[in-house]
Amino acid sequence: MLTAKKLSKSYGGVPALDALDLEVPAGEVFCLLGPNGAGKTTTLNLFLGFARPSSGAAYVASVHVEPDPIAARRQIAYVPEQVRLYPHLTGCENLAYFLGLSQTHVPPAAELSRLLTTAGLPEGAVHRPASGYSKGMRQKVVLALSQAKNAGALLLDEPTSGLDPGAVRDLCAAIRREGDRGAAVLMVTHDLGAVASIARRIGVMKAGRLVEIASAAGLSEADILSLYRRHFDPHGEATPQLPSRHGASAAPAREALS
């Protein structure tokens, strides 16, 4: 579980995140939307312990991040926008190295290879140097790490940017599997197709504040865009009307936050 309680961060007196209250339970994929500078990446950095909050608190499972960021990061697998691996090591060797940083037991190479292929890395790439890996292949190593360490949380920052449609589908399937495994998944993205594919809930951020949380159940890309535009486009559409299971129209379940 990921929990933020009145979490705030300012830089030079300018608020980047303002009193965020958020809970992402185990097994949920939660997607954060918003323009650049809205506070999305700041939120990830505070959960990861890469930055210290100005006030409030972030928790990963029961671990309070600020006093013990290393313990918190042991619970997390993190997919940044640009995954960096050791280029001279193979995918299997990279996985063994990073796993060894967070736990004493590292499975044998055969088990690591299985985890990598389960995460979607082509079998022929498992024992090749990572210098020849594409962005999507590097991401698969981190997703295998999430499985190997049984991470309680998976954080992703714009993971689909620069990927071709096939790689996006593969990545979304892997993220969905992590949620099904029981990880709390928090993904920052502008990719509405990915959001429609995997999110259980959506959060919209604006100027450091979480201004809306909506259920993603049954929402299309167009529905999500309409929801987003209500906060940023003065001429945006009204709340979309979506067909219910019985054919009647139904608006998306949502919480307006102010």
Regions found by a protein language model. Name each.
Residues 195-197:
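A short, surface-exposed alpha-helical micro-motif characterized by mixed small hydrophobic
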Residues 96, 100, 109-125:
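Conserved ABC ATPase "signature" region
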Residues 56-67, 72:
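Conserved ABC transporter NBD signature motif
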